């Protein structure tokens, strides 16, 4: 039950502080679509997704209008394609298997455009320990896929706390990202590729969303975003102690989460599917004031990236989770604070003045979601360095038993001081410096970094 005061407060949040439902994501199980015949596989996928998701956009718009709450994105996530390609590629040559994977990806892109969603996720492989033949071929196909599709997002889980880090997969993903950067305009394909440690099965956010093997047949997951609301609250607390700031953020997260769950459940009910989770992640946009960096600066930092940034971010992340957990029993996904550089106006400014560097971002990922996100680096950066950056981030996730990820973009022809413009939610990325010292020998070793002792929890 919402009292009139809460409704008025929510209206103000929407009107003045950029509060919105960032996404309603329909997860769809495709395991029953598997077939040894490629044409039948594609037909099964088409029929399944369009039958369950054909009304997603219309329904989300209807619910948005009913409550007066913007739903910015409507998305679909599917069972990791690497799990359903086995019988289809059996007996094919490597080249034929890669092409078969790409054809499935093109089918997903066609469906996404037909039903009107913003993105479709799940062109994915779960290879934290080892990779099957079909998963190897799917990973190999990612660069080619990115030249032929617009709305398909790819993700590869290369590490978990239980399994350790698959360094063969880390090495390969550095090469895949490098190749993709060289064959897509301004390396835009890399913005749709995520490398994960401990990937959640119910994440509604792109580019890393997929419908996990442990999920049901169809489910709605909602992602709420309110950096502008949190910033406005913190700015009213000048001179207050940090515990008070934390308490007020918790209260705000509680309100935001209730709204997200209400809308998510309504969309699920209208579609006749289960409601899954509400993701508590504070996801920024390039809009002024809708920035995680600005929240941290309102807490008391001259610039995001200076000393104290990691501590302030830890407090913010914890407060958001505590407030959300009190509001709902259906919390999941990533649920933290995103720090994507290109998508956050405050982060961009911090990079420009030299307050924020890649090393500090890596430290910040120890306490937040989701990792090194939308980081643009010089196009000359070698694949081995990209892999090493991924390995560092995977280690943080593995040891800390949390989700971490890397979405890094080596932009051809660009160097430190340059920018690449993507527009929309992807924003503008300043090219950040990386170490020029080589990590190639480490990456060439391959193998698997063993799981830490924390994995023995049974």
Curated annotation (Swiss-Prot):
PANTHER family, alphabetized: UPF0210 PROTEIN MJ1665, UPF0210 PROTEIN SPR0218
Family: Belongs to the UPF0210 family.
HAMAP family according to UniProt: UPF0210 (MF_01221)
Stated name of the protein: UPF0210 protein MMP1427
